[in-house]
Amino acid sequence: MVDHLGLIITAAVGAANCPERDGLEALFFLRPRGQKLPAKVIADQGYCGEDMKIRAKRYGVEVETVKRREAKGFVIEPKRWIVERTFAWFGKFRRLSKDYELVTSTSLSMMYLVMIRLMCKRVSQMV
């Protein structure tokens, strides 16, 4: 889960056979104690449906799904590019460019380390 700048709010790494819908609920449940969830989460069509809205409502979160446009060819989807940009940032780091890790907690730690590095670089450019 990322904010509007593409910075990680919280993350979870799971098995490939786990549906993304279950992963979103895991993010809500496994967040650090005291961390507030955003009031609204923007997601793609994989998270649409009443079941997902009810599951998110338990945590006080509204799920808004971004509908795909019917246009042919390459179309930039509103808001969805924010998450895709974060994945592109991760792809620049060798340990996250492929799934090298055997343990999911190591992959998660690498994601957080890369995000810390990116944020420090951004802050140093501001000074």
Q: Can you say where each PLM-predicted feature lies in the sequence?
A:
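Polybasic low-complexity intrinsically disordered regions
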Residues: 1-64, 68, 75, 111-115, ...
